[in-house]
C-alpha cells in the first residue's frame, strides 16, 4: 500500500488525458449514487458458500513463510509459483503478465502479475484484485536501524491475497453464469522510501504492476473491480475511499450495504474519505470502474485518516492478523459475488 504521506484531506480529481493521469485539487464531494437492489433476476437472494477463516489465515501464513516477497528475489519467485499452483488446483484458468517498469531509483523493477479466472466464458464478470509483493523497506519502523530491512507484509500484501485464494477455493459452488477474474498485482509496494528526497513523479513509483496491466489495454469485460489492501488487521476500518466513490460509487454503496446486512457494519464504515494512490487508480485509468477496500483509521486528533501503526514497519507480521476481520471481508465479498448484478 502506498505511503500515507499522499493521503490528504481533499480529493485528487483524476483526469485521463492521452493515457496519463493528471492530478488537480478540488473540494471533496459526496456521491449521489444509490444502492443497487441485491437480488438475482428472478428476485432470489443467493447465499454463498462458507468463507472459511482458518484456510484464509493459513494462506496468509504460507505467503509470509516464504519470507519477504521482493520482486527479483527467490522468495518472490517461489511464492509466485505456489500461488499459481493453488489457483490451478481450484480449476482456475491462469495466465501471467511479465515485464518491467521504471522504479524510483532510476532503474527498472520486474513485474509478474498473476491473473486467475473462474468461469472464463461467463459474460457477467467481476475483478477481485490484491498485490502479492511485500515492502522492501521498513521505513516507518520506530527503530531506524530497521528502515532498510524488508518487512513480512502479512497485512500489507498477504492478507488480500489470502482472501482471494479462499474465494477461489469456494468458487466451485459459484453459479456458472458469474465469472471472476482474480488479479494479483506485483511490484505495488516498492515505492520511494521515507528517507529518499521527494520528486515530482513519486506517485508513479508505486503500483508498478497495475500500471503495467493498464498499459496492456485490457478488454473491458467486467462489471467493476474490487481491490483489497490491508484487509486482515484486528480492528480494521474500511471507509468509502474518494476515487472509489467517483469511479464506482454504486458498487461501493452496494458492498457496504451488504456488509451492514451481514452484521459487519463495524468494519465497513458508512463514511467517505479522501482518495489515495493505490492499484485501483490505475485500473480506473484503464476505464475499469474500480473501488478500494483498504484499512484507514482516523489519527489521534481525528483530522485525517492513516494506515495504522504497523504500516511499513516490522510489526506487519502474523501477530496482527485477525480472523474476524478476514471473515467480515471475505463473507461480504462472497455474498456480493454470488449476487452479482
Regions found by a protein language model. Name each.
Residues 38, 231-341:
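Active-site-adjacent substrate-binding region
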Residues 70-71, 100-103, 120-122, 132-136, ...:
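Solvent-exposed loop/turn segments at secondary-structure junctions
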Residues 55-65, 78, 82-89, 159-166, ...:
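Extracytoplasmic/secreted proteins, especially bacterial periplasmic and envelope-associated proteins
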Residues 148-250, 275:
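Acidic/histidine-rich catalytic neighborhood of metal-dependent amide-processing enzymes
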Residues 1-14:
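N-terminal Sec-pathway targeting helices
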Residues 43-50, 65-74, 101-104, 146-158, ...:
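Second-shell loop/turn segments in exported
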Residues 58-121:
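A non-catalytic alpha/beta surface segment that caps or lines the substrate-entry region
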Residues 31-80, 90, 302-320:
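N-terminal capping segment at the start of a domain
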